Amino acid sequence: MTSLRPPRPTRRAVARSALALTGLTALATTAACSRPVVADQAAARESRGPVTMWTSNNEQELAWGRAIAEAWNAEQPDEQVSLQEVPAGASTEEAITAAIVAGTTPDLLFAVSPAATTDWVRQGGLVNLSDFEDGAAYIEERVGEPASGYAHEDGDYYQVPWKSNPVMIMYNRELFEAAGIDPDDPGMETYASFLEGAQKIVDSGASRSAIWPAPTAEFFQSWFDFYPLQLAQTGGTRLIEDGTTTFDDPEGVAAGEFWAEIYARGLAPQETSTDNAMAVGTTAMQMAGPWAIASYQGTIDFGIMPVPTQDGRPAEEITTFADAKNAAIFTSSRHQRTAWDVLLFATAVEQDRTLLDLTGQMPMRTGLLDVHPQYFEENPAYRVFAEQASRVADVPTARGSIEIWQRFRDAYVASAILGKRGVSEEFSSVAHDIDDLLGAGS
């Protein structure tokens, strides 16, 4: 099926089958005995030489990667960077896990999914960046307080938080106006007022649907419907905190029941869109990050607002899903010192500006608006995302994270989207299952 969202630079479609998930788990189990980790990691950490860097396969990030490689290579003739895209696969997470098993990982990856890092570390696939003398300090200085959310369970860093796509609600201003909603001040901050506005959109005939999240069961889809609302409602409480699930508490259930009401009223379709639904006018809203601006700019007159909360938190208090992609070095790298230097180079202020110019995605850096004022002055549509980027949370660092998210997604689809079971009962049941899984993995 075709994704309802415009082509998204940070994610590929993921096969939902149980076989694929079982295969991923099997890869994680067998990888430790088949990866070609460099035997002398201490020597590799100080070694310099040519390195390979992988990025996502979308045009914007490949353009950024080429710019980084060319700039580096012009100054470092003996430590050249070769750029490749992540190999095709069901998902980036599965492709990298398979590469760890096969021994084909690059030195550097600029497409790290935080959901997969804990298992990759347990496989022995990622270099501990805190072992570099300036590693932890650099990460914490660059990212600030949110950096702690990307630390491994041992407190060390195996990834550098690189870029985020804070999830907000983009809407078609023309369709809002047609429905009698003020596009400059929609007044849809609460669950109740959002439902009221969504009902107006459909009842007025302004659009076939009010909002159209992907109703499919891939593990990551909850990051773009339920999870931003849980984070917003709780001030940033993640799906798992301190080794225990949180989503079956009153705030999580309220977020799930909000979406259940959306679907029960027919305000969001239960099928997948076959085109860019908001661009063609078959829906009025989408959950999206700054990556989507390029898809709508010049096509529709759009607005941006925070995700709703039960009682309407002020915009400046809303936390949403970061949708981050990060950078890491693999233990198969023979020249980890060069890889680290390239990583530092690629995440410097100058290269952050290149990232903004080429992708519109938000560098994970404190004071982003102050660091790049000219960019946001020249590109005001991105400013609201930059403001939101300082208030984000990501997926929890947990063993078996992808399986956990898949179990949650299956329960969410059955209850909130399809209405086969009540949200509260289904959330409680799957929370017990996931807690058992977390306990077994500890």
Residues covered by each model-derived region:
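Extracytoplasmic/periplasmic substrate-recognition and gating elements
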Residues: 70, 74, 82, 179, ...
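Conserved C-terminal helix/tail region of periplasmic/extracytoplasmic solute-binding proteins
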Residues: 177, 183, 390-442
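Extracytoplasmic "Venus flytrap"/periplasmic binding protein-like
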Residues: 71, 75-142, 178-180, 284-285, ...
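Hinge/lid segment of periplasmic solute-binding proteins
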Residues: 112-166, 223, 305-306, 377, ...
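Long, aromatic- and glycine/proline-rich binding clefts that accommodate carbohydrate-like moieties
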Residues: 357-410, 414
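Glycine-centered hinge/linker elements that transmit conformational signals in sensory
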Residues: 196-200, 241-270
